[in-house]
Amino acid sequence: MANIKSAKKRAKQTVVRNERNTGQRSMLRTAVKKVIKALDANDAAGAEAAFAVAQPILDRFSARGLIHKNKAARHKSRLTARIKAIKAA
């Protein structure tokens, strides 16, 4: 355990940030899973609606550094490709 006041504060901040980041990461995963679930059900309209919700979340969290920008780009690219494939079929 930290003895210095500033170290105690930093430890407390770390706990708070960890909880916040964990919750936000969970929200992100849930949003992406909703798109995938709609895609698996061949529901193009539902997938597009879910993707419209997931895309700004991916952008926002990559801008904040919660996930890497390339990971966000990869998710968006793959989901968009799957949505286009379902619409074309």
Swiss-Prot record:
Q: Name one GO biological process term.
A: translation
Which UniProt key words apply to this protein? Ribonucleoprotein, Ribosomal protein, RNA-binding, rRNA-binding
The UniProt record lists the keyword DNA-binding: no
Q: Does the keyword Kinase apply?
A: no
Q: Which GO terms describe its molecular function?
A: small ribosomal subunit rRNA binding; structural constituent of ribosome
Q: Compositional bias of type Basic residues: which residue ranges?
A: 1-12
Pfam families to which the protein is assigned, alphabetical: Ribosomal_S20p (PF01649)
- GO CC field: cytosol; small ribosomal subunit
Q: Where is this region: Disordered?
A: 1-24
Q: Do you know which PANTHER family this protein is assigned to?
A: 30S RIBOSOMAL PROTEIN S20, SMALL RIBOSOMAL SUBUNIT PROTEIN BS20C
Q: Which NCBIfam families match?
A: S20 (TIGR00029)
Q: Which family does it belong to?
A: Belongs to the bacterial ribosomal protein bS20 family.
User: What does this protein's UniProt record list under function?
Assistant: Binds directly to 16S ribosomal RNA.
Question: What is the name attached to this protein's record?
Answer: Small ribosomal subunit protein bS20
Name the species this protein comes from. Answer: Xanthomonas campestris pv. campestris (strain ATCC 33913 / DSM 3586 / NCPPB 528 / LMG 568 / P 25)
